């Protein structure tokens, strides 16, 4: 099964350990789900899940699904943003950053969004998450997945790492680089990756990873931390990459990769994979196929200096207040347009398959850009007034939050400075005025459904749950007339409008079950 180049290299590096470390515990690749703390606890999820689970060793919020034919994208809890479908070892990297509420966090290579959803859960709606993806189509998938997960404080970018570093130098408290890689950890999961694999691809991805790491270093604030990860085994992209980075950046130190968590997993790094450069491989981590995952490498790097003081819970720093004021001023000049529609997320398999392709495209400089559409048919003042009236009725806790007009639609903005970066979303697009009435957006319900005063409460066993997710009208049992949030077991699925005992379906067409 292994590619000829891959097997020859690994046998030379590992010797007699090769067959043991690459022995898979089962013929089919393991499936995993990671639970979002924005919705519930791992214990709360396990108590309600209707499919067999066992705890993952790689992340306290993750589980291995013990049902080979499980289709996560069709499960109502997936639609409600309760879990993200992730290969088990892929959930290991994000917790290593030690993210806390109030931090500014950058996920530099974020699509399709699994690790960003973990970082958002750690922030608990406070601070800032900037999730970037260079390939335009994947950036749209990223945006859609963060909407589904109910993330309210994210900025989604479609940019190059170098431009982000130039626009936001020394800005972030934490940076995650889950680098585009040669994807050797996908061989069992995606046999097609074998056909794409070669030594030239490894070298190209290593060069790209070095450039991305240099940009990440420039964007990291003094005292900040950076976690670098890949899903490959190639020395040039793993231990060798980190060792070379430390040679270029003496201001960084290699820290124990497990220093921010209270559990252990995997194995130490390999001393013969550093390219002859010094590296304390006991501080980095590898996950081998024999350990229950497809394969991952992780290292934690700490920048010199003193970390900034984080704001008090629920408060903005003075500069963040200025950014919000600037966004409001820019919104006064907004123009009308059509409402933005939700993107259809690709399934996790397609997103994983694109990892190596994204690396090749980035190396070759290929990427298309798509611009965010504006929304609404009212003036900025009319849009804001309509939103305030709507919020007072249905989301009173949101009525006094800072709101701005973007292209005629109303946005609850993330605190983010004005730049020339290509922003796909900066906060929560709550809706727009259409035909003289405020019409809420799907993201409003996924991000703030728990605050809605009018809810249609469904359960996993309720036949109306699948009917709603399929786009059909359902009977109203608990919601009064008007707009409502449709929930499953208390978790928000989306919006609807009640009239005459029926809930008119407003679940986005692109997301519906077929």
Enumerate the language-model features and the residues they cover.
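Polybasic, low-complexity RNA-engagement segments
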Residues: 1-48, 304-514
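Short beta-strand element of Class I
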Residues: 126-130
């Amino acid at each position: 099964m292994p590619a000829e180049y891959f097997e020859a290299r690994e046998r030379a590096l590992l010797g007699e350990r090769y067959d043991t470390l690459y022995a898979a515990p089962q013929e089919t690749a393991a499936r995993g789900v990671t639970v979002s703390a924005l919705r519930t606890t791992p214990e709360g999820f396990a108590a309600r899940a209707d499919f067999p689970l066992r705890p993952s060793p790689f992340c306290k919020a993750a589980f291995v699904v013990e049902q080979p034919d499980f289709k996560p994208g069709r499960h109502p809890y997936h639609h409600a943003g309760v879990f993200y479908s992730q290969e088990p070892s892929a959930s290991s990297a994000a917790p290593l950053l030690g993210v806390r509420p109030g931090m500014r966090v950058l996920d530099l290579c974020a699509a399709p969004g699994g690790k960003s959803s973990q970082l958002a859960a750690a922030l608990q709606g406070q601070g800032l998450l900037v999730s970037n993806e260079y390939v335009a189509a994947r950036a749209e998938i990223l945006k859609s997945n963060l909407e589904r997960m109910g993330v309210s404080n994210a900025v989604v970018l479609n940019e190059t790492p170098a431009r982000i570093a130039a626009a936001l130098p020394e800005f972030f408290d934490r940076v995650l680089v889950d680098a585009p890689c040669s994807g050797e950890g996908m061989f069992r999961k995606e046999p097609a990756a074998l056909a794409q694999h070669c030594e030239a691809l490894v070298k190209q991805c290593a060069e790209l990873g070095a450039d991305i790491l240099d940009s990440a270093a420039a964007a990291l604030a003094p005292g900040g931390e950076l976690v670098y990860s890949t899903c490959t085994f190639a020395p040039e992209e793993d231990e060798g990459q980190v060792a070379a980075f430390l040679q270029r950046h003496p201001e960084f130190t290699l820290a124990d990769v497990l220093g921010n968590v209270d559990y252990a997993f995997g194995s130490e790094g390999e001393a013969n994979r550093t390219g002859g450069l010094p590296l304390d491989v006991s501080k980095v981590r590898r996950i081998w196929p024999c350990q229950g995952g497809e394969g991952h490498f992780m290292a934690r790097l700490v920048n010199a200096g003193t970390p900034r003081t984080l704001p008090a819970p629920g408060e903005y720093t003075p500069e963040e207040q200025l950014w919000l004021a600037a966004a409001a001023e820019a919104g006064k000049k907004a123009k009308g347009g059509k409402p933005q529609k939700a993107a259809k997320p690709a399934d996790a398999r397609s997103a994983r398959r694109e990892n190596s392709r994204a690396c090749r495209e980035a190396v070759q400089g290929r990427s298309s850009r798509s611009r965010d559409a504006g929304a609404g048919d009212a003036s900025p003042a009319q849009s804001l007034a309509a939103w305030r009236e709507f919020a007072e009725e249905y989301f009173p806790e949101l009525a006094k939050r800072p709101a701005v007009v973007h292209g005629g639609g109303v946005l609850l903005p993330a605190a983010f400075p004005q730049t020339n970066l290509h922003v796909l979303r900066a906060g929560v697009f709550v809706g727009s005025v259409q035909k003289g009435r405020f019409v809420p957006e799907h993201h409003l319900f996924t991000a703030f459904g728990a605050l809605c005063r009018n809810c249609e409460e469904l359960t996993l066993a309720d036949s109306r749950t699948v009917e709603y997710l399929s786009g059909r009208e359902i009977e109203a049992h608990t919601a009064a007339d008007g707009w409502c949030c449709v929930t499953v077991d208390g978790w928000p699925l989306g919006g609807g409008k009640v009239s005459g005992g029926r809930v008119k379906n407003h679940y986005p067409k692109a997301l519906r079950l077929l």
